[in-house]
Amino acid sequence: MSAFENIAEELKKLRQLQGWSQEDLARNLGVSFATVNRWENGKTKPSRLAQEKIKQVANTGK
C-alpha cells in the first residue's frame, strides 16, 4: 500500500467513525468537498497544515 493509499484509507476511516459525509469533514476542516474527495481517492495528499487540522478534528470530533 502506498503512502497516498494509507492516508486515503485513514481519512475515510476517521470520517466514517464520526458518521460524517465528505461534505461534513470538509466543513470541519475548512476545505472544499472536492479537496476531501481527492484526498480519499488518493489523487492528492493533504498538506502538513491540513494533516495537523485532521489530527485536531480526529481528537475533538469537530
Summary of predicted features, one role per range:
Residues G19-N37:
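Short alpha-helical DNA-recognition segment
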Residues S47-K62:
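DNA major-groove recognition helix of helix-turn-helix/homeodomain DNA-binding modules
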Residues M1-L17, K55:
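A short, Lys/Arg-rich alpha-helix, primarily the initiator
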